[in-house]
Amino acid sequence: MAKIAFDELRFVVADDNAHMRRIVRTLLRAFGCREIYEAEDGASGLEAVEAYSPDILISDITMPIFDGIELTRMIRNPEGCRHPFLPIIILSAYSEKKHVIAARDAGASEFLCKPVSATALYRRIQNVIANPRDFIRTKTYFGPDRRRYVNPNYSGVERRIGDGSENIVDPDQVHIEA
């Protein structure tokens, strides 16, 4: 695990729940962070991002005025925000796939389910710092590239050989002989 200089990082934590902001702030302080700015809704979160130029935004998904998904979209709009490359970690009590996909499609860098643990938060922060994803722009999206790395040397039974769905292997149909 790479060591992170938390004392050199600036965070904005946007969450409408004061108790959750306090938990995240306490964890960040325990990691060594000195600069933490808080916001109680999406609008003040965007203002804090513009005012403090953080290194990372940690945002709840459900907040008043506009939620974490809308906040992420606003930040990822290069014409609307000065920090479109800002790493964004979405926190949510909603762990259903549709919420994870919505956050990903809005341009979130990471998704973390509540209740949050110190280890999980540290790993997400470490990932956005040590292993940042390249950004891509399409007609409908600007944000971290969510495509997975394809290892050309992998030759397992689930290896895709082309772009067509006919090459997708159904694990239930694979018979491996010993």
Residue ranges and their predicted role:
Residues K98, V116-I129, R133, R137-T138:
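C-terminal output helix
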Residues S109:
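Short, glycine/charged-rich "phosphate-handling" switch motifs in NTP-dependent
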